């Protein structure tokens, strides 16, 4: 589908994990937490639940609630979809941060017209207000590595995306 051979894909995957080795251990750690606890928490504490179960053996199986999974597959079951835990952590935390930005902006009387993923479309009255918006967004969530906000302006949204 991607026009890359299996060998090339495996090589790229191996190079990636050599260059950023913490990703694999983070992925394993978050997946294990989801498996053991049935949930993970995003950066701001929102719960992402893993409430469905599937058989331990590899294959195509429908994920089921615990009682149904035990009835259908017996005791050899595990939580389903825990391989998605890292993605839920990252995407969920990004969503938390965007929502926190929107809330902080709202408290200052600034309302976004639309949100698209981690992007906000806001009517801005002046350069001073634009700087205030950037400052609010960069400080909405305190992290060890500071947040950076990219700001673009134009007469309309179409002008910005050309």
Predicted regions and their residues:
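Conserved catalytic core of nucleotide polymerization and phosphodiester-bond processing enzymes
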Residues: 1-162
């Amino acid at each position: 589908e991607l026009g890359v051979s299996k060998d090339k894909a495996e090589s790229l995957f191996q190079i990636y994990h050599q260059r950023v080795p913490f990703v694999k251990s983070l992925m394993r750690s978050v997946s294990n937490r989801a498996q053991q606890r049935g949930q993970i928490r995003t950066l701001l504490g929102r719960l992402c639940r893993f409430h469905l179960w599937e058989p331990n053996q590899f294959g195509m199986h429908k994920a089921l609630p615990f009682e149904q999974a035990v009835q259908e597959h017996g005791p050899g079951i595990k939580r389903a979809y825990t391989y998605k835990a890292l993605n839920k952590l990252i995407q969920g935390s990004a969503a938390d941060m965007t929502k926190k930005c929107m809330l902080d902006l709202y408290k200052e009387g600034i309302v976004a017209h639309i949100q698209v993923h981690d992007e906000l479309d806001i009517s801005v009255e002046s350069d001073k207000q634009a700087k205030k918006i950037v400052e609010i967004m960069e400080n909405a969530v305190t992290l060890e590595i500071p947040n950076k906000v990219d700001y673009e302006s134009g007469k309309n949204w179409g002008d910005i995306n050309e």
